[in-house]
């Protein structure tokens, strides 16, 4: 009986000690996740934007081979570059908000569930010890 009652406080302290590092790893994980979001969004947007100008340049180059070709590439790249910079400025802000908010909610729900489970386990453990004793 004594050994069983002594094991309960140890599990309780382990739960507390585990909850603190989890919070640290969660914040670190959020930072790395937001960075990966930025990179993935930038990569997907840059690929899609690089494909669209290439498809536009080929027909313009084929149709306007009489000398307009030199004018069209000179006038078209500056606005395209400007659009890319605008996307790169806006894209990191959006995913961080979307990525972090749901994660925070999920983490909070997970922590509440673990606390409830710990209480249930302790209650079941107490009832088992009472019935056996």
Swiss-Prot record:
Its transmembrane ranges are none
Biological processes annotated in GO = acrosome reaction; penetration of zona pellucida; positive regulation of protein processing; sperm DNA condensation
Localization, UniProt: Nucleus; Nucleus, Nucleolus; Chromosome
A Pfam family of the record is TP2
Report where it is expressed, by tissue. Answer: Testis.
Q: Name one GO cellular component term.
A: nucleosome
- Which residue windows does the record flag with biased composition (Polar residues)? 1-26, 124-133
Q: Where is this motif: Nuclear localization signal?
A: 110-118
Provide the GO MF annotations for this entry: DNA binding; zinc ion binding
Q: Which keywords accompany this UniProt record?
A: Chromosome, Developmental protein, Differentiation, DNA-binding, Metal-binding, Nucleosome core, Nucleus, Phosphoprotein, Spermatogenesis, Zinc
Q: Where is the composition biased (Low complexity)?
A: 46-72
State the residue spans of region: Disordered. 1-133
Q: Where does Zn(2+) bind?
A: 12, 16, 24, 26
Q: From what superkingdom does this record's organism come?
A: Eukaryota
Which coarse location class describes where this protein primarily resides? nucleus
- PTM Phosphoserine: list the residues: 132
Similarity comment: family membership: Belongs to the nuclear transition protein 2 family.
Described by its record, this protein's role is as follows:
Plays a key role in the replacement of histones to protamine in the elongating spermatids of mammals. In condensing spermatids, loaded onto the nucleosomes, where it promotes the recruitment and processing of protamines, which are responsible for histone eviction.
Q: What is this protein called?
A: Nuclear transition protein 2
């Amino acid at each position: 009986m004594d050994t069983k009652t002594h094991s309960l406080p140890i599990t309780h302290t382990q739960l507390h000690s585990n909850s603190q590092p989890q919070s640290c790893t969660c914040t670190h994980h959020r930072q790395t996740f937001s960075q990966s979001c930025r990179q993935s969004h930038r990569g997907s947007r840059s690929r899609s934007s690089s494909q669209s100008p290439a498809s536009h340049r080929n027909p313009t180059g084929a149709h306007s081979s009489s000398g307009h070709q030199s004018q069209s590439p000179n006038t078209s790249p500056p606005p395209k570059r400007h659009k890319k910079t605008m996307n790169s400025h806006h894209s990191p802000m959006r995913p961080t908000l979307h990525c972090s908010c749901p994660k925070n909610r999920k983490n909070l729900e997970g922590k509440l569930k673990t606390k409830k489970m710990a209480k249930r386990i302790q209650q079941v453990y107490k009832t088992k010890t009472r019935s056996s004793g």
